[in-house]
Amino acid sequence: MNRQGDKGSVLSGYRVLDLTDDKGMLCSRYLADMGAEVIRVEKPGGSAKSPFSWENLGKRAVTLNIELEPGQEVFRRLAENADVLVESYPPGYLEALGLGYPRLSQINPRLVMASITAFGQRGSYRDDKSCDLVASALGGQMYVCGEAESPPLKPFGSQSYYLAAIFAAIGVMLALWHRHTSGRGQHVDISLLECVAAALDHVLVRYFYQGAVAKRQGSLYWSNAFRIFPCRDGHILFSLFQQWETLVEWLASDGMAEDLTDEKWRDRGYRLQHLDHIIEVLERWTKSHTVAELVEVGQLMRFPWAEVASISRILASPQLKERDFWVEVELPESGKRYKFPGAPVKLSRSPWRVGIDNNR
């Protein structure tokens, strides 16, 4: 079917209906960026304002009250000609309106419907109230974040929503691929809880195989291989054990190796047992240097070190600029142009379509 969409884009010619809140707006944004025609269905009187504008780049929008029969009839007609529906209502809500997958799949057997909910379409928690905080807590994310002596902490931002949106986009693409061979759509069930737990595979697998319970250890990486250290003018992500002899020689050249030149420290097991002492010595050393000094020389020595970049430093990143990561888009509600994150994935033959509908 010939529809709007950039020719050559991965999803050019596909139509997506968007019935999501902040749990799923990013999913349909990615589909729009890949060339799909995304129609966002909003309640009358409601519109997406900043900070959610960036999650709705490239989408068209219609207002429709799907709780009333006239709006439901219009939505069914939209679904009849759609390829994908992404929604994030509580389980059972759309079914009660006659807009659930069983009914819509009768109207359009090729429809792929992705539902992003707190706990999925079944299970004992299905109807429980939730949010990003709940998903982070129940999914184990909070348990492993924070200092050893502090209570569990939540990572910054709505991480469960971002994870769910990405997994949902993958699920939609897989369902569309399956439709090419089967001719039929299917229901993609996305659970925030499961998305968070899936992202903790390294923590869970260690427990399954070794019985090891992950502990909160601040900025120290779970494998003890990396840690964040303070410098004179910021912070650096620092590898602790790679090329140990080279690192100690560097400290010694600055007169700050202390006892790390002793033969006993060449043993990795000994270093792991006395990690606190190594951290103390390294911290005194990093505080004597700027971030740029350590990163520049460290990279020359092939250490995987990096500045812990502030927001302003991210915006000024030459790497992101050279790869055209940032896009400027004029928002219809204000007429002002703003900079937004662009495509995290670049395809050599299928360019992303970022924000093109916002300027029409």
Where do the PLM segments sit?
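Active-site-adjacent "lid/gating" segments in soluble enzymes
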Residues: 30-34, 97-237, 241, 249
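Conserved small-residue-rich beta-alpha loop and adjacent elements
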Residues: 8-46
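Short glycine-/small-residue-rich Rossmann-like dinucleotide-binding loops
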Residues: 21, 66, 90-91, 117-118, ...
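Flexible, small-/acidic-enriched active-site or ligand-binding loops
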Residues: 2, 152, 331-360
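A structured beta-alpha segment of the ubiquitous adenosine-cofactor-binding alpha/beta core
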Residues: 17, 55-106, 287
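Conserved PLP cofactor-binding pocket of PLP-dependent enzymes
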Residues: 297-320
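Glycine-rich phosphate-binding loop and adjoining beta1-alpha1-beta2 segment
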Residues: 33-65
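Aromatic-enriched alpha-helical interface/lid elements that frame and gate functional surfaces
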Residues: 225-301, 305
